[in-house]
Amino acid sequence: MKESLPKALKELRLSGMAQSLEVRLQEAAGNGLTHQEFLELILQDELLVRNERQMQRRVKAATFRELRTLEDFDWQFNPSIQKKQIFDLATCRFLEKGQDVCWLGPPGTGKSHLCQAIGYQAIKAGFTVRHSQGSRVFSLGRRPKALN
């Protein structure tokens, strides 16, 4: 049975459980965990692995040029950027309300970095994101709602 359990977990596509099974079994034996406590731990391991994989898939599907974060942004670079407004966008409330955001400004002002960073925040909040430069969107014939 010892070898059939990991095989069954993989067949059931429970790779998170399969990865942590041995460690969790030792932990359960050493700490006298109940069956329920043990089951909760390996289920949490599985959920963690699945959430990480889902996050990776969403980041890949977003087609970011680079993964950017708000923590990486140099706020001294462009002091005219309203930090409070950017962090408000990072809450993703505008998405929950079905609103659009259009970034305008000359090249080199931080638009792409901030856009990708907020996109990453949206992915972490569970939204599906697709990054595209404005020139590409307009060349495809799509127009933001604000311009319709």
Placement of each model-derived feature along the sequence:
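Short hinge/gating elements
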Residues: 7, 23-27, 72, 101-104
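Interdomain "pre-motor" coupling segment immediately N-terminal to P-loop NTPase/helicase cores
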Residues: 10, 15-66
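Short glycine-rich substrate-engagement loop in P-loop NTPases that contacts/grips substrate
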Residues: 80-86, 130-148
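Phosphate-binding P-loop
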Residues: 89-99
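Walker A/P-loop
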Residues: 93, 102-129
